[in-house]
Amino acid sequence: MKKKHLYLLIATLTVAAVLPIIILVCFSSANEPQRPVTIIYRNTEYAYKEFLTGCVLSCLKTLDEPPADDESEGINAVAVALDCSLRYLHSAGKSFDSGYPYVEYMDEKESIQHFGAETGIYRKYAEHSAEYAISLDLTVQEGTAFLPVCRISSGITISPEDSGNPFVKKLYCEKDKSAEYYHSTCQLTADGIAEIMLTAYPSLIIPPDESKWISDIRRDADGNALRLNVCGIDMSCEEFRRLFDIRSPAFEMSYTQRLYSFDIRGDGCNSGMSVYSALMLSKRGYSCREILNEFYAL
């Protein structure tokens, strides 16, 4: 074999061996997992436990009714996953409120507006689960990892290959379809799309054909959007959903008379743990650790 061919073969084998490690590193940190004392989120500083509590509350906001004691193991599992993700974001030097991956937080004012008179019940479970997660201090492969949580899946979660996160599992969460907030609709006006895109991309030149502003949607085998083109910008579905407040990557889209309409299934990233299914497992007697193992490759 000629030397140059031998070198090429060695280089190819080296890349093939290293690539899975590169993907793993993108969603994990093997350093000693440090928990920050405070977190800056949207220019406000929060004590860590308070912030974790607010993240748990955000995950509970689509429940049909306040949680009960037989759902506490599921809520604990949610808090543990969020705590691990927060420590990963901190150790990786990533922002908590921008880019991807990221977390969602519900402050005290928003929780009162959403839960009303039942706020105290929700907060009791959220605070207890935050304390549990901090005391457990879960590590993944001797480090931290981003463990995504969605409130309600569309029935089929995104695979680790398509999500790029080796710690998630592809699951069929059929019971999520019975959740009250499983289905939703959303509309975006052409003017609204232009305003949002110009705010995010000030130098963007908006194309003239409004009917093609959102196009080239690339999906996985189950129909979940992975990437798409918006006004000439190729972006991930996560960025698109964050910009336009689309609840789930499982959506169908139509355009008519300067209006984009979305028919959406599920609520959240549609990858990793479904809160709705986690609470169902808790009711069936699953422990926190058993629930985590259902959704993540730990």
Name these PLM-found stretches.
Residues 1-298:
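Conserved, single-site charged/polar hotspot
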